[in-house]
């Protein structure tokens, strides 16, 4: 049973994220006095204030209300709060990621992009090329977008991944499909064929973010 008060959870999350009371108040749309009262459990946030507070503290409303530890990994990121900046590299560099000790020299890279997603320090951006991941309906990641690749995330069925096929110099971007013990790289565009992989492919990383970077 969690005996911690709601105010203590609010204060602990704020401290962990290194946010001042005044800054948190601006993010939520209340005064720093209100934040102080919440943290001392004199009053409690509810309704829209609770939702805004959970987003600012990157946790679920249930965690703040009840201390549900299973919800602490559910993050609510604000679009205006970057979690980090990562380099935009070439598809050739991405294809060499598995072999190189240092696949790219960060200090030599000019283009960096922010993300609101938590990811490993070795993550990198790639610019989407071609229309193989442009779908007629549903999820579609067309040319002109950039994708953030995290090499530390486990590639699971249904995840979008960047992989390197044997004999190819550049990496490729596809959806990983596992079916009856077989693995495939599936384009989101049905006009392109699926590629079965069976030891002839290395998964470089999992796509954890995507955004439009270049307007036509």
From Swiss-Prot:
<dbReference type="InterPro" id="IPR036286">
    <property type="entry name" value="LexA/Signal_pep-like_sf"/>
</dbReference>
<dbReference type="GO" id="GO:0003677">
    <property type="term" value="F:DNA binding"/>
</dbReference>
<keyword id="KW-0804">Transcription</keyword>
<keyword id="KW-0678">Repressor</keyword>
<protein>
    <recommendedName>
        <fullName>Repressor protein C2</fullName>
    </recommendedName>
</protein>
<dbReference type="InterPro" id="IPR039418">
    <property type="entry name" value="LexA-like"/>
</dbReference>
<dbReference type="Pfam" id="PF00717">
    <property type="entry name" value="Peptidase_S24"/>
</dbReference>
<keyword id="KW-0805">Transcription regulation</keyword>
<dbReference type="InterPro" id="IPR001387">
    <property type="entry name" value="Cro/C1-type_HTH"/>
</dbReference>
<comment type="function">
    <text>This protein allows the phage to reside inactively in the chromosome of its host bacterium. This lysogenic state is maintained by binding of regulatory protein C2 to the OR and OL operators, preventing transcription of proteins necessary for lytic development.</text>
</comment>
<feature type="site" description="Not N-formylated">
    <location>
        <position position="1"/>
    </location>
</feature>
<feature type="DNA-binding region" description="H-T-H motif">
    <location>
        <begin position="21"/>
        <end position="40"/>
    </location>
</feature>
<keyword id="KW-0238">DNA-binding</keyword>
<dbReference type="Pfam" id="PF01381">
    <property type="entry name" value="HTH_3"/>
</dbReference>
<dbReference type="InterPro" id="IPR010982">
    <property type="entry name" value="Lambda_DNA-bd_dom_sf"/>
</dbReference>
<dbReference type="InterPro" id="IPR015927">
    <property type="entry name" value="Peptidase_S24_S26A/B/C"/>
</dbReference>
<feature type="domain" description="HTH cro/C1-type">
    <location>
        <begin position="10"/>
        <end position="64"/>
    </location>
</feature>
<dbReference type="InterPro" id="IPR050077">
    <property type="entry name" value="LexA_repressor"/>
</dbReference>
């Amino acid at each position: 049973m969690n005996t911690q008060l709601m105010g203590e959870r609010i204060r602990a999350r704020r401290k962990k994220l290194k946010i001042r009371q005044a800054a948190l108040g601006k993010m939520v749309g209340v005064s720093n006095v209100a934040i102080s009262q919440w943290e001392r459990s004199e009053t409690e946030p509810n309704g829209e204030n609770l939702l805004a507070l959970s987003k600012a503290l990157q946790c679920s409303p249930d965690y703040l209300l009840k201390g549900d530890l299973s919800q602490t990994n559910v993050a609510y990121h604000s679009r205006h709060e970057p979690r980090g900046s990562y380099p935009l590299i070439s598809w050739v560099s991405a294809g060499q990621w598995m072999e190189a000790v240092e696949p790219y020299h960060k200090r030599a890279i000019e283009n960096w992009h922010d993300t609101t997603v938590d990811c490993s320090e070795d993550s990198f951006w790639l610019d989407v090329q071609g229309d193989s991941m442009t779908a007629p309906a549903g999820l579609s990641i067309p040319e002109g977008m950039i994708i953030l690749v995290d090499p530390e995330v486990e590639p699971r069925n249904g995840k979008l991944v960047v992989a390197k096929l044997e004999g190819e110099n550049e990496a490729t971007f596809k959806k990983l499909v596992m079916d009856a013990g077989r693995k495939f790289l599936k384009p989101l565009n049905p006009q392109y064929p699926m590629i079965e992989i069976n030891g002839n492919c290395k998964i470089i990383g999992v796509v954890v973010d995507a955004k439009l970077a270049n307007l036509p």
